[in-house]
UniProtKB/Swiss-Prot annotation:
Functional summary from the UniProt entry: Plays an essential role in the initiation and regulation of chromosomal replication. ATP-DnaA binds to the origin of replication (oriC) to initiate formation of the DNA replication initiation complex once per cell cycle. Binds the DnaA box (a 9 base pair repeat at the origin) and separates the double-stranded (ds)DNA. Forms a right-handed helical filament on oriC DNA; dsDNA binds to the exterior of the filament while single-stranded (ss)DNA is stabiized in the filament's interior.
Name of the encoding gene: dnaA
GO cellular component, one term: cytoplasm
SMART domains membership: AAA, Bac_DnaA_C
Name assigned to this protein: Chromosomal replication initiator protein DnaA
Localization, UniProt: Cytoplasm
Region (Domain I, interacts with DnaA modulators): 1-69
Family: Belongs to the DnaA family.
Domain writeup: Domain I is involved in oligomerization and binding regulators, domain II is flexibile and of varying length in different bacteria, domain III forms the AAA+ region, while domain IV binds dsDNA.
NCBIfam families cross-referenced by the UniProt entry: DnaA (TIGR00362)
Gene3D superfamilies for the chain: 1.10.1750.10, 1.10.8.60, 3.30.300.180, P-loop containing nucleotide triphosphate hydrolases
Length: 450
């Protein structure tokens, strides 16, 4: 059952945000199981209450799907004093800064283990929608607290904000190992603050966060409406900024659009550089898929890459999820990934783009690219330029539409299906060792899919 738990958490990691998974799923440990229940160990009572409220059904679902049968979960708190009276989390969040503290000495903590090893600048694909944020992040990583401070990066879910935040941390730790770097989500900041209040260790908490050289905070919008957390983060921000320490923050919204955020915090977020990340365009999605398939060693044919990239999704995480899904199906079934297999597997997610592309559209675009007329593609002229353009158009019709060989032939001047098959196979063979032809077809596909 331990293996089932491990597989279930791996599945959750693929669909949850980096910060949520690291904060709330990673700290949970498998204990034991019986016929109906899986017993899991959590670090604190507050953590248990949070999981009960926000993630219990998620965990039950993940375990049950992975195991192939329904399981319940039982959360066990791993604390020495489980009977101690614990204040309500909301009370702590609102009144936290008024709590009595016990002086505790602590050295600033350098949190490198929380950095995702997969999120580096080398593995980040830069495109028109993210190149400004990418350049700003690299500038900060190479010269912390010297260029843009704070750096505020905002954009929609799954567009690469966490990737850039982690990449900054990796670069600074590699080039300046003497600097203390802490990466955490705003949710984790609140959770650790509440824990410190309950244990009366706010001095230790403040010493940790206010003596850093670099603070990287993900999803700052989480502190919206949380008065006590905003108060504590305000003083943490001031302490670091006054000491000229680097602060980088991400959010799903522009500072002015974050609701229930104190004006003094909002204005501080706007002191430095604000960089946005836009959804990737077609070219960037293609580059991302090629990079991810290389990293994961999932063999993804060119036509499948274009099929995925042309989907309506504007979320990089969803693209990665589709890639992983195809890779898993291919591995489990022992079959290669093909365009037909991808269409069948992902039809509920992205539908079938073939209905949007017609033979006439392909003929029009190919003719324009070769400086020909559409009638030339339908003729029987044997000039080399005509023949190649006609074969490419037929190959694209086979690849990008639902038409049968006879239907395609009918639209190319009444050619029979054997002629269509021959033309398509001719291009298949040529693509294996003709990079120039590959680029021509890639360019035409980009036009068709826009």
């Amino acid at each position: 059952m331990h293996d089932v738990w491990r597989q279930a958490t791996e599945n959750l990691e693929k669909v949850m945000s980096e910060s949520d998974f690291t904060t709330w799923i990673q700290p949970i440990s498998y204990s034991h199981a019986d016929d109906t229940t899986v017993f899991l160990t959590v670090p604190t009572l507050f953590f248990k209450e949070w999981i009960d409220e926000h993630y219990r059904q998620v965990l039950v679902g993940a375990l049950s799907v992975t195991a192939g049968k329904k399981y319940f979960i039982e959360l066990v708190v791993q604390e020495e004093d489980q009977n101690a009276e614990v204040p309500q989390a909301e009370d702590l969040i609102i009144k936290g800064h008024q709590e009595i503290e016990q002086p505790v000495t602590s050295q600033p903590e350098t949190s490198s283990s929380s950095l995702n090893p997969k999120y580096t600048f080398e593995l980040f694909v830069s495109g028109t929608g993210n190149q400004f944020a990418h350049a700003a992040a690299m500038a900060v990583a190479n010269n912390p607290a010297d260029t843009y401070n704070p750096l505020f990066i905002y954009g929609g879910v799954g567009l690469g904000k966490s990737h850039l935040l982690n990449a900054i941390g990796h670069t600074i730790r590699s080039s300046s190992p003497n600097l203390s770097v802490c990466y955490c989500s705003a949710e984790k900041f609140m959770y650790e603050m509440v824990n410190a209040l309950r244990q009366k260790r706010m001095d230790q908490f403040r010493s940790r966060f206010r003596n850093l050289d670099v603070l990287l905070v993900d999803d700052i919008q989480f502190i919206s409406g949380k008065v006590g957390t905003q108060e504590e983060f305000f003083h943490t921000f001031n302490a670091l900024y006054d000491m000229q320490k680097q602060i980088v923050i991400t959010s799903d919204k522009f500072p002015r659009e974050i609701s229930d955020l104190e004006e003094r915090l909002r204005s501080r977020f706007e002191w430095g550089l604000i960089a946005d990340i836009q959804p990737p365009d077609l070219e960037t999605k293609i580059a991302i898929l090629k990079k991810k398939s290389e990293i994961t060693r999932i063999q993804l044919p060119e036509d499948v890459i274009y099929f995925l990239a042309s989907s309506d999704t504007r979320n990089i995480r969803e693209l990665e999820g589709m890639l992983i899904r195809l890779g898993a199906y291919s591995s489990l079934q022992g079959i290669p990934i093909t365009l037909d297999m991808a269409r069948e597997n992902l039809k509920e997610i992205i539908g079938d783009r073939r209905k949007d592309i017609t033979v006439e559209l392909i003929q029009k675009v190919v003719a324009e690219q070769f400086g020909l007329k559409m009638a030339d593609l339908k003729s029987s002229k044997r000039l080399k330029n005509f023949v190649q353009a006609r074969q490419i158009a037929i190959w694209l019709c086979r690849d990008m539409t639902s038409f049968s060989y006879p239907d395609i032939g009918a639209k190319f001047g009444g050619k029979d299906h054997s002629t269509v098959i021959y033309a398509a196979k001719k291009i298949d063979l040529a693509l294996k060792d003709d990079p120039k032809l590959s680029r021509i077809i890639e360019d035409i596909k980009l036009i068709l899919l826009k």
